Amino acid sequence: MNTSNKTMSLRVIFSAFVLTFTLNACAQNVPSTVAKPAGTAAIQPDAEAWETDLSKAIALSYETKKPIMLFFTGSDWCGWCIRLQNEVFRTETFTKWANENVILVELDYPRKKEQPQTIKDQNKQLQQMFAVQGYPTCHFVMPTPTDDGRINLASIGQNGYMAGGPDAWIAKVTEFLPKK
């Protein structure tokens, strides 16, 4: 190997070392959580208001005669999902409206948070059933029993993120929800 090839090889090795060191240092400085916008921390809806088990939500829907809101989200990585939660779902206006009008179901596809395998399987099946291509997506459904003992989730509408806060979001979904 001649001197120019040795010099070139050393440069490549040195550049790879510097690049690896720089990337490693940058990765250590990335915050592990996304900060909430100012003014959103004061109102947190009851976490138990959001079901994760669809069968429990169906039972509640039968009992209350309310439709189910299926919220497909990537809670720990999807920027638009986090915005929707902060700007709409974590507000007093939405919490009050939801308690009166729908059964809330969170169908989460996290990257960092662990979930029971049964929830992962349920969420994957529902994602395929509703052909969800992106997050956040909210499907509104009414469960209806079929003659063969199964349950049909009749779609009544869908929505995702939209600007305008809780009032605009609620006005949009109220257009297709059953009237009381």
Where are the predicted features?
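Typically the conserved alpha-helix immediately C-terminal to a functionally engaged Cys/Sec
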Residues: 81-97
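Non-catalytic, surface beta->alpha helical segment in thiol-disulfide oxidoreductase systems
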Residues: 87, 128-180
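Thiol-based oxidoreductase modules, predominantly thioredoxin-like and allied folds used
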Residues: 48-51, 94-121
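Bacterial N-terminal signal peptides that target proteins for export
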Residues: 2-14
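Bacterial N-terminal signal peptides
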Residues: 12-24
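Boundary at the C-terminal end of the N-terminal hydrophobic targeting segment
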Residues: 25-27, 35
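Short active-site neighborhood of thiol/selenol oxidoreductases, capturing the structured segment around
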Residues: 64-78
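A short beta-strand-turn-helix
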Residues: 50-68, 98
